[in-house]
């Protein structure tokens, strides 16, 4: 089963919220968020690859990921985890970074509307033995255009995740 709800913008800053159901156990979907082999297969929009997914999946840990564009440009992000409840919830802050994990303001590279710290909350819900649902929420955007760009990329990523876990 594949259900995707539309993203929405709310409040003084804007957020992206995406809910998706999977024909897979919640533990398998949760694993896809922290297993480096899985993350390399789904954490990129169409046409991109993820050559680096150095996962340090623990509260206080920081993962380093790299998306490579079709023309070979590398874009690094870190995920710094503040809360992990197995099979229930992951909270992290995404930062754009250099290849060494040093964060920078996305506006410095022409990405106005993306905050330096993009808070992510992923909730997981079991819908039965082989069915689950996640909701991904990204917080802090200041531009409706960036919300739409992030939503489009997130939908592509989560569709790739579905192909892996189902």
Q: What feature does the model see in each segment?
A:
Residues 1-50:
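Hydrophobic ligand-binding cavity/cleft-lining segments
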Residues 20, 52-53, 77-83, 117-126:
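Hydrophobic/aromatic beta-strand elements that line small-molecule binding cavities or substrate pockets
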Residues 26-28, 56-58, 82-90, 123-133, ...:
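A short, structured loop/turn motif at beta-sheet edges
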Residues 29-32, 39, 63, 81, ...:
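Hydrophobic pocket/interface hotspot
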Residues 91-94, 101-155:
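Beta-strand/loop substructures that line and gate deep hydrophobic ligand-binding cavities in soluble
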